[in-house]
């Protein structure tokens, strides 16, 4: 029994490491596109934060939801987004997740439970809380994860939604 558990852990660790490498590879390629002026708009890299997205998304199911930040590429990849559609989105192509209209800071893949990135600092917190409220009302066994950065801690919305989530016992994790 112990041997199989070790194998399972080794497989999980390898899967998570591979996912972290995939995110870094995506970010390196996206950065090159940006620096070569082939990508319209701005981009904010997620390099160095890969373990956060992978560790959290590894525990989620496809029906669980996430919301993201302006540095959302890693969250998207960790939740199962395809590179081709992500790069198409970054390049403004119709084949992108948002038909090329969202760009780097607004990628969403609802088929994988990714409700989208948000360029507004702390802007996805209300969306995540609303998604968790919806899950609770519908009796779904889903959780919503709201990724946010340190800048969001200066936004009043953060404290308002955390208070609401605690009072209403919503299935949301602020990470």
Model-found features: residue ranges?
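Conserved acidic
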Residues: 12, 20, 41
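N-proximal short alpha-helices
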Residues: 3, 25, 97-101
């Amino acid at each position: 029994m112990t041997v199989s558990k070790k194998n399972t852990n080794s497989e999980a660790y390898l899967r998570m490491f591979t996912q972290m490498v995939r995110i870094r590879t995506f970010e390196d390629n996206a950065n090159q596109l940006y620096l070569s002026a082939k990508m319209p708009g701005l981009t904010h890299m997620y390099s160095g934060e890969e373990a956060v997205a992978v560790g959290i998304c590894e525990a989620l199911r496809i029906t669980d939801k996430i919301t993201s930040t302006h540095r959302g590429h890693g969250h998207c990849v960790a939740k199962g987004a395809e590179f081709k559609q992500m790069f198409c989105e970054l390049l403004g192509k119709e084949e992108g997740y948002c038909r090329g209209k969202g760009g780097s800071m607004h990628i969403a893949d609802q088929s994988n439970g990714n409700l989208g990135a948000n360029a507004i600092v702390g802007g996805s917190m209300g969306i995540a809380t609303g998604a968790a409220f919806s899950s609770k009302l519908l009796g779904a066994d889903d959780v919503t994860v709201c990724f946010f950065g340190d800048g969001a801690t200066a936004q009043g919305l953060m404290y308002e939604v955390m208070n609401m989530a605690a009072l209403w016992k919503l299935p949301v994790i602020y990470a």
